[in-house]
Amino acid sequence: MSKKPVRVAVTGAAGQIGYALLFRIASGEMLGKDQPVILQLLEVPVEGPQKALKGVMMELDDCAFPLLAGMEAHSDPMTAFKDADYALLVGSRPRGPGMERAELLAVNGAIFTAQGKALNAVASRNVKVLVVGNPANTNAYIAMKSAPDLPRKNFTAMLRLDHNRAASQIAAKTGKAVADIEKLTVWGNHSPTMYADYRFATINGESVAKMINDQEWNANVFLPTVGKRGAAIIEARGLSSAASAANAAIDHMRDWALGTNGKWVTMGIPSDGQYGIPKDTMFGFPVTCENGEYKLVEGLEIDAFSQERINKTLEELQGEQAGVAHLL
């Protein structure tokens, strides 16, 4: 018996990440090859983006995806999020030349307050929300705080791109297959302050930390490479990393929906106070997923170097939260 279609809302649907994302959702890569989807696509109420969205929908039609049960174009989050089972909040205001971070936070604050309120009003009560648009952790925090009638656990931020970048660097360093890396995590903010942590990681049961055994490489090569990878891609490509961000969003949502079989992944989730992270802070943590729920990996030892890195990324996040407090 075929499954009932689920509703997937995507914001910024005509943008670069949206374009790299929608065809993969419609083909079944995110929710499984037996799960029909209805795409509810949101773009800003401006002629250019709305017209571009129509073009993307024409292409989606032309793929004749068996799992694409329907799609709709929207310019208002109140209609785009109606009964949504999944919401990928991709659209955000990028930082323009000469724009101060505070200004960026304020502009995005307004966007994510409105979207949080709309989700609160019309989305499924079990909606799974992933914020991709930067600053992702703080935008997710704003959306969560603007949706008091939805469970906090429904809101997540994307740290998976940092996680995948870290895995790829470790695979290159060790000469091993990226698929064999387990128990890797990224703590904190999706920003250059994030802390990619391979102290517990294994490859085919062997310790990655022992394999690499080079703290100087960790502190001076690995962490800066992962932290500044986005900037390096803009420098090389002239555009930001869209396909790899879309891929990370698919990974994050697929694992959350379908489970990780006991494997660790990284998700930005609202803290309940574990590891000394204040409650409600949207923070990257190691989690496992099953039955549509994520579960924090608890009881990991935090050494002095790790604590210093975690404190640094937390401090940045708390500064961002303070910068949007007046909006909430």
From Swiss-Prot:
Write down the Pfam families for this protein, in alphabetical order.
Answer: Ldh_1_C (PF02866), Ldh_1_N (PF00056)
Catalyzed reactions per annotation: (S)-malate + NAD(+) = oxaloacetate + NADH + H(+)
Q: Write down the EC number.
A: 1.1.1.37
Alphabetized, the UniProt keywords read: NAD, Oxidoreductase, Tricarboxylic acid cycle
According to its UniProt entry, the function of this protein is described as: Catalyzes the reversible oxidation of malate to oxaloacetate.
Q: Name one GO biological process term.
A: tricarboxylic acid cycle
Which family does the UniProt entry place this protein in?
Belongs to the LDH/MDH superfamily. MDH type 2 family.
Q: Which GO terms describe its molecular function?
A: L-malate dehydrogenase (NAD+) activity
| Residues binding NAD(+), per UniProt | G12, A13, A14, G15, Q16, I17, G18, N108, Q115, V132, G133, N134
Keyword Oxidoreductase applies: yes
Cross-referenced PANTHER family: MALATE DEHYDROGENASE
Name of the protein: Malate dehydrogenase
Q: List the disulfide bonds.
A: none
- Residue positions binding substrate: R95, R101, N134, R165
Q: What is the lineage of its organism?
A: Bacteria, Pseudomonadati, Pseudomonadota, Betaproteobacteria, Burkholderiales
**Active site annotated at which positions?**
H190
Q: Does the keyword Amino-acid biosynthesis apply?
A: no
Identify the SUPFAM superfamilies for this entry.
Answer: LDH C-terminal domain-like, NAD(P)-binding Rossmann-fold domains
